[in-house]
Curated annotation (Swiss-Prot):
Enzyme Commission (EC) number: 3.2.2.8
Record's protein name: Pyrimidine-specific ribonucleoside hydrolase RihB
A single BP term in Gene Ontology: pyrimidine nucleobase metabolic process
A Pfam family matched in the record: IU_nuc_hydro
Xref: NCBIfam families: PRK09955.1
Purpose of the protein: Hydrolyzes cytidine or uridine to ribose and cytosine or uracil, respectively. Has a clear preference for cytidine over uridine. Strictly specific for ribonucleosides.
Length: 313
């Protein structure tokens, strides 16, 4: 099994925490570092959340704080879904884990420039850190093996009728990434909403046990409430974790190559990922877009990672 080297760029966030849990434990993933961006909440809160998850699960991977603001637009947060802390629900022990002193953007640039072109970037929040790194040092572009991101939709948005939250939170950054020429894989809402975490799934992870099972339960029981109140869903989709699933085994997710463009015009479609599903524009595809996921396979993978945190001694 190939071990994929990745940098996980996230804005924790309930589903981000599940992505961290999976990426740090599965043997197919070599998690080099975790970079944090503002998104689901402000940077001070998302950073604390990322550190809390790492401390709770004893994940010894360096964590770097990144961009506190979008490139251009006024900052927004998703407190309607993730609460005031950005990770409401779990109760953590007093935090002793600290972030690295290096800025996340510098870490991304330095790590890529020193690499053999074998590192995959996995941004599952707004694309601010990735876009700024690309603009600061364009020489990183050929060094990026692939970008596997959570964001966008070829159908309906979730923050506006047109736009998904991660892209809407920094459309200009997304525009930079989608025009970069780097190989892109997009896990949008059309796919990620197929991973609704029902009470049955939560009970399954509770039975699996260990610290990750406990954390999963605390996290996803909170989103049961907010996702139903906001979207009428039967549970919280674990949007970000689909990227980790794809990296572990892309055969579990069906994708379609499309030309994708981010709308940065101020108007009702601001932040929309315009996906040319039928190829009517005649432009070459720049993105593999997630279409369907094998949910039985996916939840089995999540459970495998949860069980990996159970100590046997």
């Amino acid at each position: 099994m190939e071990k994929r080297k990745i940098i996980l760029d996230c804005d924790p966030g309930h589903d981000d925490a599940i992505a961290i849990m999976m990426a740090a434990k599965h043997p197919a993933i070599d998690l080099l570092g975790i970079t944090i961006v503002a998104g689901n909440q402000t940077l001070d809160k998302t950073l604390i959340n990322g550190l809390n998850v790492c401390q709770k699960l004893e994940i010894n991977v360096p964590v770097y704080a990144g961009m506190p603001q979008p490139i251009m637009r006024q900052q927004i947060v998703a407190d309607n879904i993730h609460g005031d802390t950005g990770l409401d629900g779990p109760v953590f022990e007093p935090l002793t884990r600290q972030a690295e002193s290096t800025h996340a953007v510098k870490y991304i640039i330095d790590t890529l420039m020193a690499s053999d072109g074998d590192i995959t970037l996995v941004p599952v929040g707004p694309l601010s850190n990735i876009a700024v790194a690309m603009r600061m040092q364009p020489a990183i572009l050929p060094k990026i093996r692939e970008i596997v991101l959570m964001g966008g939709a070829y159908g309906t948005g979730n923050f506006t009728p047109s736009a998904e939250f991660n892209i809407f939170a920094d459309p200009e950054a997304a525009r930079v990434v989608f025009t970069s020429g780097v190989p892109l894989v997009m896990m949008g809402l059309d796919l990620t909403n197929q991973t609704v975490c029902t009470p049955d799934v939560i009970a399954r992870m509770e039975r699996a046990g260990g610290p990750a099972g406990e954390l999963f339960s605390d996290i996803m029981n909170f989103t049961l409430k907010t996702q139903f109140e906001n979207y009428g869903l039967a549970g919280g989709p674990v949007h970000d974790a689909t990227c980790i699933g794809y990296l572990i085994n892309p055969d579990g997710i069906k994708t379609q190559e499309m030309y994708v463009e981010v709308d940065v015009n101020s108007g009702p479609c601001y932040g929309r990922t315009v996906c040319d599903e039928l190829g009517v524009l005649g432009k070459p595809a720049n993105t593999k877009v997630g279409i369907t996921i094998d949910s039985d396979w996916f939840w089995g993978l999540v459970e495998e990672c949860v069980r990996g945190y159970i100590k046997t001694h």
